[in-house]
Amino acid sequence: MERGAVLFALNHMVAPKLRLAEFLALASSLGISRVEIRNDLSGNVLLDGTPAADVAITVKQAGVEVVSINALQRFNDWSLAREREAIELADYAAESGAKALVLVPRNDGQGCGESERHANLTSALKALAPILASRGLAGLVEPLGFEICSLRLKSEAVKAIDAVQGADVFKLVHDTFHHHLAGEAALFPDRTGLVHISGVDDPTVAVSDMRDSHRVLIDASDRLDNLGQIKALRAAGYTGPLSFEPFADNVHKLDAAQVRDSLAASMALVAAGVTA
C-alpha cells in the first residue's frame, strides 16, 4: 500500500545494478507501485536489448506501472537523427506499457541564447507532439538547473508548450534538485506530471557547484528544501507521484537490502514531513 496520501515512485537510478525484475521487486517490497525505467543503464533495460514486449510482461507480473521511460536526451536539439531516436524510443515506451517519455534538454552550454532557446524548444515540441500523441504517451519536459543548460526554467517550458498548443500532450517534471539550482520561485502544479526527488547533504559544496554526483536520498541534512518544495506543490494541488532519483555513488554502491532500508527511512521522513 502507499504511505498515506503520499504517492512514491522509484526511478531505476536508485539501484542501477539491479536487473529489471529485481528492481520491480524492490519497489513492491516498499509498497511502491510506480516506477521509471531508463535507457542509459549499461547492461540493463533498455541498453541490453530486452524487447519491449518482455518488459511489458515482467511489469505486469510484478503488478507495477511504468510511469515513464527516462529519457530522450537533447530533445530540443531537433534533427532527423533526433526524430528517428524519438520514434524508436516512443515505440518502445508504448509497447512496454509506459505512460510517458521524459524529455531532457541540451546541457552543454550550446543553444542558450534567449531567442534560440524558445525557437528550438517550440520546434522540437511541435515535432514531438504527434509522435507521442499517436502512441498514447505524454511528454514530460524536465528543465535542468545547471547554468550550462538550454532549458533551466519551467516557465519557459510552459510558454513553449502553450505556443504549440501542446498542453494535452506535454507536462512538466518538477525535479527538486534542479528547481533549487535554477532558483525559480514559480511552481506549476497543474502543469506537472511527475516530481523527481533527491537530496544534497554535503555541507561544503556551493549551489553553483552541485552536480548529479551529489544527489542522495533525502535525509534530515537535506539542503534543497525538498519538504518545503513538496508541501508547496501538494498545497497547490499536485497529487502525482514523487519519484526517487539519486545519482550519488554512495547510494549506488548499496546492496538491495541496504538500499531498501535507506529508501524506507527516506520515505518515512518525507511522508511525515509533508503531511504534518
Feature-to-residue mapping (PLM):
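Histidine-acidic metal/acid-base catalytic patches
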Residues: M1-A9, K17, A21-S33, A56, ...
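Active-site beta-loop-alpha junctions enriched in small/polar residues
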Residues: N11-A15, R38-S42, A71-R74, R106-D108, ...
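Active-site acidic/histidine proton-transfer and metal-coordination neighborhood
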Residues: A21-A25, Q61, E65, D77-L172, ...
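Short, well-structured secondary-structure segments
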Residues: S33-N39, E65-I69, L101-L103
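Glycine-rich, proline-tolerant flexible connector loops at the mouths of alpha/beta enzymes
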Residues: E36-K60, N107-G113
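Hydrophobic alpha-helical membrane-association signature
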Residues: P51, E85, L121-A124, S262, ...
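Short, basic/glycine-rich phosphate-binding loops at helix/coil junctions
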Residues: E65-N70, A138, S208-D209
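The substrate-binding groove and active-site-proximal loops of carbohydrate-active enzymes
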Residues: L72-L80, V216-A220
